[in-house]
Every structure is written in structure tokens, then in C-alpha cells.
């Protein structure tokens, strides 16, 4: 597959491919510098063409969804940034409980649709500010539930091959563990996922449970300020938020980044935070917890564009 100037021009003309786009608006923390190239494909068919175009130019490729659990450097990202938030849509079978969703489908939207159809299993997901694709990659979870419990398979585009190719991976191939999957370390781009939910439940009851879960999250977590969601994985059996709070770190700030006064496992952007502010505050919290408790906190956050890894 060779991508000539004609197809490139067509992608630019329809707004799929753009240059020097600020990425702050693409992350829930509202920080991050510009993408050298940003692509927002509207169909799965456009993705192999974009990947091949980047490969022919030896450009690095970065993948983002809704931008939660993501910290992009102030200097931005070189190469091609693929954002899949426009790849939306889902199909639910109320009789069998089978659900198929595009990678960019917002997880709360899917959770509400499932509840309305009487399909049990995604009530926990209603307050997670991410996409189906991101949930599969991170094994997102909340309130005792997680993606791995309902996911059957994912459709991926392999871009490590000579030519980008489509494949389907089963749950067993994804090696799920707490907030982790094999998708975090391979060259696969999730474009769709399939779930098995439990059919035949009362939609009104499921919607009540879903609303209750959302109300609990919005009352205990800082939804009024930009954040990425939970910053650190829980070092079981401990809870990261409780450890941080026990050290009096709620309200601690560096620049415009602050440990939330409402929930200590959240770092919020109070208005003028930079990615460097947030990164420094993450390191500060890790250091304080290690010194006082001897416990290493590991971020859930994916960091892109930084010169040195944490």
C-alpha cells in the first residue's frame, strides 16, 4: 500500500489529517503541546492508510482516545498522533447479551445503553471518562467491576507488520491483570471490542443502579476540575487515595496542579497547570509515600512525549 499525495490531500481536505494541532483539548487534564500531525479517522478503513503514510515517512505513531489517563508533554508529540474519538457506535442484542462497540465509543454511553436494554454487567462503567478502546487497553474498572470480566474479544490493526493488517484477539490472548493488558506493550491498535453481558434484567432497575453509581462517583470525585481520573494504581490491599490522604497531601500543589481536596488519588488542573507541573506533583507524591510508608505508588497514567521515562 502506497499513500500518494492525492489520498493525503483528500484526508486533509475532509479534516481527518491536520498539522500542528494543540493537544490540550484532546486530554481530560487539558494540558499538552501540539501534535506534529494529528489524525482523527472517521472509519476503520482510513487507519491502515494513515499508518502506512506515517511508516513511509518514518514518523513515530502515538495513539489516544478520549484523553483520560494520559499526560502529554508540554512540548507536544512528534510524528503522527492517532485519535480515535470519532470512531463511535455500538450494536446491542437484548436477547443474547452480545454487545459490539467501536473503539471511540464513550464508555458511559455504552453503559447507559446496556442498562436501558436490560443488559447487566457495565453498571460500574458509567462514571469512567474514557472510551471502549482505552478501557480494553487499560483494563479499566471501578466499584468492583472491570473490563476483563465482560470483554470477549477485540479487533485490532497490527502496525508492526510490513503492511497494517486487521486481526481479532480473544480475551485469553490479552493477558489481563489489574489495570493492565498485553495491548499496552504490543503494536496493536484497538478499533472495536465485543462484550458478553447478561440479558433479561429489568431495565428500570439497571438504570437505577447505573444512576446511583454515577451519583456516588460525582459526589466523591472532583468532576468540576480537569483531571485524568485516578492517578495511581491501588497497591493492594492498600488504597492509594487513603495513603496519600493519611500524609496530609490533599491540597498540595505545584504550579497549577493540585492534589484534589475531594479525593487524594486525583490531581486536578486548577486553571493554568502545565504537564511539567503535573509530572512533578506525581513524583512528589510518590516520594512522600515511599519515605513515610515504604510503598511504591505506580501511576495508571500513560505519559507521552517526555524525554526521560519515570
From Swiss-Prot:
Primary location class: cytoplasm
Protein's name in the database: UDP-N-acetylenolpyruvoylglucosamine reductase
Subcellular location: Cytoplasm
Membrane found in the keyword field: no
Family membership noted in the UniProt record: Belongs to the MurB family.
Coiled coil: none
Pfam family, one: FAD_binding_4
GO biological process: cell division; cell wall organization; peptidoglycan biosynthetic process; regulation of cell shape
Recorded superkingdom: Bacteria
Active site positions, chain numbering: 179, 230, 300
Annotated pathway: Cell wall biogenesis; peptidoglycan biosynthesis
UniProtKB keywords: Cell cycle, Cell division, Cell shape, Cell wall biogenesis/degradation, Cytoplasm, FAD, Flavoprotein, NADP, Oxidoreductase, Peptidoglycan synthesis
Domain FAD-binding PCMH-type: 30-200
Gene Ontology terms: cellular component: cytosol
Molecular function (Gene Ontology), one example: FAD binding
Keyword Transcription: no
Cofactor: FAD
InterPro entries in UniProt: FAD-bd_PCMH, FAD-bd_PCMH-like_sf, FAD-bd_PCMH_sub1, FAD-bd_PCMH_sub2, MurB, MurB_C, MurB_C_sf, Oxid_FAD_bind_N
Function: Cell wall formation.
Catalytically driven reaction(s): UDP-N-acetyl-alpha-D-muramate + NADP(+) = UDP-N-acetyl-3-O-(1-carboxyvinyl)-alpha-D-glucosamine + NADPH + H(+)
Amino acid at each position: 500500500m502506497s499513500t500518494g499525495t492525492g489520498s493525503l490531500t483528500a484526508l486533509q481536505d475532509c479534516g481527518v489529517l491536520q498539522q500542528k494541532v494543540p493537544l490540550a483539548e484532546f486530554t481530560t487534564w487539558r494540558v499538552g503541546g501540539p501534535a506534529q500531525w494529528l489524525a482523527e479517522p472517521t472509519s476503520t478503513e482510513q487507519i491502515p492508510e494513515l499508518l502506512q503514510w506515517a511508516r513511509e515517512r518514518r514518523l513515530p505513531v502515538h495513539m489516544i482516545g478520549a484523553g483520560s489517563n494520559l499526560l502529554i508533554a508540554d512540548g507536544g508529540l512528534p510524528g503522527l498522533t492517532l485519535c480515535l474519538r470519532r470512531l463511535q457506535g455500538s450494536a446491542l442484542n437484548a436477547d443474547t447479551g452480545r454487545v459490539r462497540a467501536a473503539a471511540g465509543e464513550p464508555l458511559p454511553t455504552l453503559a447507559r445503553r446496556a442498562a436501558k436494554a436490560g443488559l447487566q454487567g457495565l453498571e460500574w462503567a458509567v462514571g469512567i471518562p474514557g472510551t471502549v478502546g482505552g478501557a480494553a487497553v487499560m483494563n479499566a474498572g471501578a466499584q468492583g467491576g472491570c473490563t476483563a470480566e465482560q470483554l470477549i474479544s477485540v479487533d485490532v490493526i497490527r502496525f508492526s507488520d510490513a503492511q497494517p493488517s486487521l486481526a481479532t484477539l480473544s480475551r485469553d490472548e490479552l493477558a489481563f491483570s489489574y489495570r493492565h493488558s498485553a495491548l499496552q506493550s504490543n503494536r496493536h491498535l484497538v478499533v472495536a471490542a465485543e462484550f458478553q453481558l447478561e440479558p433479561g434484567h429489568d431495565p428500570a432497575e439497571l438504570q437505577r443502579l447505573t444512576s446511583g453509581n454515577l451519583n456516588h462517583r460525582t459526589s466523591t470525585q472532583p468532576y468540576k476540575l480537569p483531571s485524568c481520573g485516578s492517578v495511581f494504581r491501588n497497591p493492594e490491599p492498600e488504597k492509594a487515595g487513603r495513603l496519600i490522604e493519611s500524609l496530609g497531601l490533599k491540597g498540595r500543589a505545584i504550579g497549577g496542579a493540585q492534589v484534589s481536596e475531594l479525593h487524594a488519588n486525583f490531581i486536578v488542573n486548577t486553571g493554568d497547570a502545565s504537564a511539567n507541573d503535573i509530572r512533578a506533583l506525581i513524583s512528589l507524591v510518590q516520594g512522600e509515600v515511599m519515605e513515610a510508608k515504604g510503598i511504591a505508588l505506580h501511576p495508571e497514567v500513560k505519559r507521552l512525549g517526555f524525554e526521560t521515562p519515570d
